A protein has these predicted regions:
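Metal-dependent peptidase/peptidase-like ectodomains
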Residues: 109-172
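Alpha-helical metal-binding/catalytic segments enriched in His/Glu/Asp
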Residues: 29, 48-99, 141-147, 156-180
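Broad gene-expression machinery/nucleic-acid interaction feature
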Residues: 15, 85, 116, 140-144, ...
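Hydrophobic/aromatic beta-strand patches that form the interior of the parallel beta-sheet core
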Residues: 2, 27-29, 89, 117-119, ...
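Acidic/histidine-rich catalytic neighborhood of metal-dependent amide-processing enzymes
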Residues: 61-136, 196-201
Length: 205
Protein backbone atom coordinates (compact mmCIF):
# COMPACT_ATOMS: atom_id res chain seq x y z
CA UNK A 1 0.00 0.00 0.00
CA UNK A 2 1.39 3.40 -1.01
CA UNK A 3 0.31 7.01 -0.51
CA UNK A 4 1.42 8.95 -3.59
CA UNK A 5 1.91 12.62 -2.71
CA UNK A 6 1.33 15.37 -5.27
CA UNK A 7 3.66 18.40 -5.53
CA UNK A 8 2.54 21.28 -3.24
CA UNK A 9 2.14 23.68 -6.17
CA UNK A 10 -0.62 21.46 -7.63
CA UNK A 11 -2.81 22.07 -4.56
CA UNK A 12 -4.36 18.62 -4.88
CA UNK A 13 -4.53 15.63 -2.58
CA UNK A 14 -2.47 12.56 -3.35
CA UNK A 15 -3.57 9.05 -4.26
CA UNK A 16 -3.78 5.82 -2.29
CA UNK A 17 -2.67 2.73 -4.22
CA UNK A 18 -2.59 -0.88 -3.03
CA UNK A 19 -1.00 -3.60 -5.15
CA UNK A 20 -0.93 -7.38 -4.89
CA UNK A 21 0.95 -9.56 -7.32
CA UNK A 22 -0.42 -12.90 -8.44
CA UNK A 23 -1.27 -14.93 -11.50
CA UNK A 24 -4.12 -14.86 -13.97
CA UNK A 25 -5.89 -11.74 -15.19
CA UNK A 26 -4.64 -8.47 -13.73
CA UNK A 27 -7.44 -6.43 -12.13
CA UNK A 28 -7.51 -2.67 -11.57
CA UNK A 29 -10.23 -1.40 -9.20
CA UNK A 30 -10.75 2.37 -9.17
CA UNK A 31 -12.32 4.70 -6.61
CA UNK A 32 -11.70 8.23 -5.39
CA UNK A 33 -11.32 9.85 -1.99
CA UNK A 34 -12.35 13.46 -2.63
CA UNK A 35 -15.83 14.94 -2.67
CA UNK A 36 -17.42 18.20 -3.81
CA UNK A 37 -18.19 19.64 -0.37
CA UNK A 38 -16.14 22.60 0.83
CA UNK A 39 -14.44 22.34 4.22
CA UNK A 40 -16.74 25.03 5.64
CA UNK A 41 -19.94 23.49 4.27
CA UNK A 42 -22.67 22.82 6.84
CA UNK A 43 -22.87 19.21 5.67
CA UNK A 44 -19.72 17.86 7.30
CA UNK A 45 -20.77 15.38 9.96
CA UNK A 46 -20.49 11.64 9.41
CA UNK A 47 -23.26 9.74 11.18
CA UNK A 48 -24.16 6.08 11.25
CA UNK A 49 -27.53 4.70 12.31
CA UNK A 50 -27.61 0.92 12.12
CA UNK A 51 -26.41 0.05 8.64
CA UNK A 52 -27.19 3.50 7.20
CA UNK A 53 -24.39 6.07 6.93
CA UNK A 54 -24.78 9.73 6.00
CA UNK A 55 -22.14 12.35 5.38
CA UNK A 56 -20.28 14.24 2.64
CA UNK A 57 -19.17 11.95 -0.16
CA UNK A 58 -21.14 8.90 0.96
CA UNK A 59 -22.64 8.33 -2.49
CA UNK A 60 -19.77 9.93 -4.42
CA UNK A 61 -18.00 7.79 -3.74
CA UNK A 62 -17.34 6.28 -0.34
CA UNK A 63 -19.99 3.67 -1.14
CA UNK A 64 -18.00 2.39 -4.12
CA UNK A 65 -14.79 2.41 -2.10
CA UNK A 66 -16.49 0.28 0.56
CA UNK A 67 -17.66 -2.15 -2.13
CA UNK A 68 -14.06 -2.58 -3.31
CA UNK A 69 -12.75 -3.22 0.20
CA UNK A 70 -15.47 -5.65 1.21
CA UNK A 71 -15.38 -7.49 -2.11
CA UNK A 72 -11.67 -8.09 -1.54
CA UNK A 73 -12.38 -9.15 2.05
CA UNK A 74 -14.94 -11.65 0.76
CA UNK A 75 -12.50 -13.02 -1.81
CA UNK A 76 -9.88 -13.36 0.89
CA UNK A 77 -12.37 -15.11 3.17
CA UNK A 78 -13.08 -17.82 0.61
CA UNK A 79 -9.40 -18.20 -0.21
CA UNK A 80 -9.30 -16.99 -3.81
CA UNK A 81 -7.53 -13.68 -3.26
CA UNK A 82 -4.19 -15.28 -2.42
CA UNK A 83 -3.23 -15.91 -6.03
CA UNK A 84 -4.96 -12.92 -7.65
CA UNK A 85 -3.15 -9.96 -9.19
CA UNK A 86 -4.97 -6.80 -8.08
CA UNK A 87 -4.30 -3.08 -7.94
CA UNK A 88 -6.66 -0.75 -6.07
CA UNK A 89 -6.41 2.94 -6.98
CA UNK A 90 -8.11 5.57 -4.82
CA UNK A 91 -7.39 8.95 -6.42
CA UNK A 92 -7.53 12.19 -4.46
CA UNK A 93 -8.48 14.60 -7.24
CA UNK A 94 -11.31 13.05 -9.23
CA UNK A 95 -13.66 16.01 -8.85
CA UNK A 96 -11.07 18.49 -10.18
CA UNK A 97 -8.02 16.85 -11.69
CA UNK A 98 -4.62 18.22 -10.79
CA UNK A 99 -2.55 19.83 -13.53
CA UNK A 100 -0.41 18.80 -15.28
CA UNK A 101 -2.04 15.46 -16.07
CA UNK A 102 1.38 13.98 -16.74
CA UNK A 103 1.90 14.11 -12.96
CA UNK A 104 -1.58 13.77 -11.47
CA UNK A 105 -2.58 10.84 -13.70
CA UNK A 106 0.82 9.18 -14.13
CA UNK A 107 0.23 6.31 -11.69
CA UNK A 108 -3.35 5.70 -12.81
CA UNK A 109 -2.33 5.57 -16.48
CA UNK A 110 0.47 3.15 -15.69
CA UNK A 111 -1.95 0.96 -13.73
CA UNK A 112 -4.40 1.06 -16.63
CA UNK A 113 -1.73 -0.12 -19.06
CA UNK A 114 -0.78 -2.89 -16.62
CA UNK A 115 -4.33 -4.18 -16.13
CA UNK A 116 -6.23 -6.69 -18.22
CA UNK A 117 -9.55 -5.69 -16.66
CA UNK A 118 -10.46 -2.34 -15.10
CA UNK A 119 -13.57 -1.63 -13.03
CA UNK A 120 -14.65 1.76 -11.71
CA UNK A 121 -16.89 1.73 -8.65
CA UNK A 122 -18.78 5.01 -8.95
CA UNK A 123 -22.39 4.53 -7.85
CA UNK A 124 -24.79 3.17 -10.45
CA UNK A 125 -28.54 3.80 -10.52
CA UNK A 126 -31.75 2.10 -9.51
CA UNK A 127 -34.52 2.34 -12.11
CA UNK A 128 -37.98 0.77 -11.99
CA UNK A 129 -36.98 -1.25 -8.95
CA UNK A 130 -33.90 -2.81 -10.56
CA UNK A 131 -30.22 -2.13 -9.91
CA UNK A 132 -28.17 -1.19 -12.94
CA UNK A 133 -24.45 -1.45 -13.57
CA UNK A 134 -22.67 1.21 -15.60
CA UNK A 135 -20.73 -0.41 -18.43
CA UNK A 136 -19.29 2.77 -19.96
CA UNK A 137 -18.54 6.36 -19.02
CA UNK A 138 -18.94 9.44 -21.15
CA UNK A 139 -16.03 11.67 -21.97
CA UNK A 140 -16.24 15.44 -21.75
CA UNK A 141 -14.84 18.51 -23.42
CA UNK A 142 -14.78 22.15 -22.41
CA UNK A 143 -15.07 25.20 -24.63
CA UNK A 144 -14.80 28.95 -24.15
CA UNK A 145 -17.26 31.05 -26.15
CA UNK A 146 -16.24 34.68 -26.66
CA UNK A 147 -18.69 37.04 -28.35
CA UNK A 148 -18.00 40.69 -29.19
CA UNK A 149 -20.46 43.36 -30.25
CA UNK A 150 -20.60 46.97 -31.35
CA UNK A 151 -20.71 49.48 -28.52
CA UNK A 152 -23.77 51.70 -28.93
CA UNK A 153 -26.72 53.27 -27.16
CA UNK A 154 -29.37 50.77 -26.09
CA UNK A 155 -31.97 52.55 -28.21
CA UNK A 156 -30.23 51.19 -31.28
CA UNK A 157 -30.27 47.53 -30.24
CA UNK A 158 -31.67 45.18 -32.92
CA UNK A 159 -31.05 47.70 -35.69
CA UNK A 160 -29.00 46.69 -38.71
CA UNK A 161 -26.23 49.05 -37.59
CA UNK A 162 -25.96 47.87 -33.98
CA UNK A 163 -27.28 44.32 -34.00
CA UNK A 164 -28.55 42.36 -31.01
CA UNK A 165 -25.57 42.95 -28.74
CA UNK A 166 -22.93 40.51 -27.55
CA UNK A 167 -24.92 39.13 -24.61
CA UNK A 168 -28.00 38.43 -26.70
CA UNK A 169 -25.84 36.78 -29.34
CA UNK A 170 -24.12 34.61 -26.73
CA UNK A 171 -27.53 33.57 -25.40
CA UNK A 172 -28.67 32.72 -28.94
CA UNK A 173 -25.61 30.55 -29.57
CA UNK A 174 -25.98 28.74 -26.24
CA UNK A 175 -29.66 28.09 -26.87
CA UNK A 176 -28.85 26.77 -30.34
CA UNK A 177 -26.43 24.29 -28.78
CA UNK A 178 -29.15 23.27 -26.32
CA UNK A 179 -31.75 22.78 -29.06
CA UNK A 180 -29.33 20.73 -31.15
CA UNK A 181 -28.16 18.28 -28.48
CA UNK A 182 -31.17 17.82 -26.18
CA UNK A 183 -32.78 14.46 -26.67
CA UNK A 184 -29.62 12.80 -28.01
CA UNK A 185 -28.96 9.72 -25.89
CA UNK A 186 -26.04 10.15 -23.52
CA UNK A 187 -25.25 13.68 -24.68
CA UNK A 188 -25.56 16.73 -22.43
CA UNK A 189 -24.53 20.35 -22.69
CA UNK A 190 -24.06 22.79 -19.84
CA UNK A 191 -23.10 26.45 -19.79
CA UNK A 192 -21.06 26.54 -16.60
CA UNK A 193 -20.41 30.27 -16.16
CA UNK A 194 -21.27 33.33 -18.23
CA UNK A 195 -20.09 36.92 -17.94
CA UNK A 196 -20.91 39.96 -20.03
CA UNK A 197 -21.44 43.68 -20.14
CA UNK A 198 -20.00 46.49 -18.06
CA UNK A 199 -22.79 48.65 -16.61
CA UNK A 200 -26.55 48.89 -17.16
CA UNK A 201 -26.62 52.67 -17.43
CA UNK A 202 -23.52 54.78 -18.06
CA UNK A 203 -23.38 58.30 -16.66
CA UNK A 204 -20.49 60.28 -18.09
CA UNK A 205 -20.60 62.77 -15.22
Amino acid sequence: TQWIEMPPEMNRAGHLFARKEGTGKKLLLIGHLDTVFESDDDFQAFTRTGNIATGPGISDMKDGNAVIIYALKALQHIGVLDDMSVTVAFTGDEEMTGKPLSISRKDLIEAGKWADITLGFEGAITSEGSDWATIARRSSSGWTLKVTGRQAHSSGVFSDRVGAGAINEAARILNTFYEEVRGDYGLTFNAGTIQGGTVVNYDAT
